[in-house]
């Protein structure tokens, strides 16, 4: 039986690698240059919660403590990493044993579910249309979907490998 510690370690390692590649793919789009959908979840959360957080003084306290400005690149990058790792944890704890098939298929299913939520809920709520079609061309939508899918498939495949290795005692990565 796998321990929660090995599950978390495998998820964080797989998630770190997958979010690193995803981030590199999205950065490469900037070099092309190609506009892709990104930051939708952060924009939506900002739209929904910013007024309440401002009234509660969270923004002022945040700045006084010297944390990165939420609209800035550093905060956005950190948010992207944290969400990627949270998605890795969600996969390892709740989805991995429930989704059918091999790891790559589980990753595709996870990618499809999250992409559908982003395309049909998050981006339309932001006024960007289905899959961001109001501001993105077909190539931008496709590139974003591909970078997104790479994250989830790589996450699932690496998680299976690292979790299996840790169970067999073959993985020498320590999270102590």
Model-derived regions, located:
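Short, charged juxtamembrane terminal tails flanking transmembrane helices
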Residues: 1-5, 163-176
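N-terminal signal-anchor transmembrane alpha helix
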Residues: 2-38
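Extracytosolic (periplasmic/ER-lumenal) interhelical loops and adjacent juxtamembrane/interface segments
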Residues: 31, 35-70
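Alpha-helical transmembrane segments of multipass membrane proteins
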Residues: 14-26, 83, 87, 91, ...
